[in-house]
Amino acid sequence: MFNYSRRNKIPFHISTQASVANIASAKFYKKLGAERIILARELNLKQVKELKGILPLEAFVHGAMCVAVSGRCFTSQFLFGRSANRGVCIHPCRRSYIIKDKQEGYELELDNDKVMSAKDLCMLPYVEEMKKAGIFSFKIEGRGRDPRYVDAVVREYRKALDKRLTKAEVIEGMKELERVFNRKFSTGFYLGKPTPKDFSDIEHSAATESKEYVGKIVHFYSNAKAGSIKIESNEIKVGDEICIIGNTTGIEKMKIESMQVNNLPVQVGKRGDEVAIKLPERVRKNDDVYVIIRK
């Protein structure tokens, strides 16, 4: 594959699953023609800095962490025939487990029975340190995440890459990241070896916000900057924060200041209503509408 790529002038990067963790392996892949290395997840920042200058370095900065070394896990494949290396892992590491005595079959439930479920990586407060260590490309894990997650995480790290964040901006950024899917946060190996505190006890998500489907956009009037929502589920009220998601629109968030049904002002829109509201940004017919629920 390396020979084929070089012969056809196809650039290639070395995956984190190659576990590049030292100078010798970095130089080895450079000699083979690699243009970039995605570093092993088990390196601390001091070790990363030692690889600076050999090849451009990419590293994970945020997202779910596999309990296996650099993600080389076969548990899902072995138990369920779903290979993590083919993108279809069903995450058996996130399940609850018990200890079983082989001799008598006695079972013990652990205090934290999620013995393989790591917290999510979050390095937002340490982006500057990662830059100084030589990392120039920041990798976000987000397989299977919804548009709100992608929007929030990319937005916050984009800010951190564009300029050095103040302490207040980091705090506000962390609040934004906590609003979307997470299993609580850890710095992984970057600041030292993980401890038991870096394992999660969360069943699903520790997000401080969730979203409930409301309905779809049925009209949008660009000149008036207004449109209407057909409510198919639940209800919306004046003062609610909503997000509108569509393939072309992306994600737009706004607070409902006023609503009308049949040209009459209302405080609540119920299932079956077509509710007219102001829409400051362009949206499109059939975009999905969700109300944001704060926990």
What are these regions (language model features)?
Residues 11, 27, 35-295:
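Surface-exposed amphipathic alpha-helical tracts and adjacent flexible/coil segments at the periphery
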